[in-house]
């Protein structure tokens, strides 16, 4: 969860900034903020994602000394690391739409992502033979991709 603090913060800041500019009828500034927010959040996502992908075992060892738990959590964190890239886009878009007052859309795309994509994908992937936590974890970035597509369509 701590890996997602940066993109979450970007999303919240985006909502506040966009709301101010939406109210001032300066969507040019709101759109520019979305662009720069995505770029800088993407840079942060690459750094945190790389840490999780390459050093997830060290991060996991903070919480457990059991090597099987560390290896399993590192496997899952590798999939989570992939999502760090996508959440750079997604959370900025969600902040943008929240700032514009499109909260119903934010809710609907979240439900579609979680219930329509992530849960079914995780279930279906978990049914594969010799499945790993990495493979199951890929349901999360898959969901993010669908949610980003919805955000781009809405834009």
Question: What feature does the model see in each segment?
Answer:
Residues 20, 32, 61-62, 75, ...:
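Transmembrane helix-loop junction
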Residues 1-56, 87-109:
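Small-residue-rich hydrophobic transmembrane alpha-helices
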Residues 47-70, 74:
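Short membrane-interface helical motifs at transmembrane helix boundaries
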Residues 1-3, 67-93:
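Alpha-helical transmembrane segments of multi-pass membrane proteins
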Residues 5-8, 52, 95, 121-122, ...:
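Structural signal for membrane-spanning alpha-helices in multi-pass inner-membrane proteins
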Residues 41, 77-80, 84, 110-111, ...:
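Residue-level recognition of transmembrane alpha-helices
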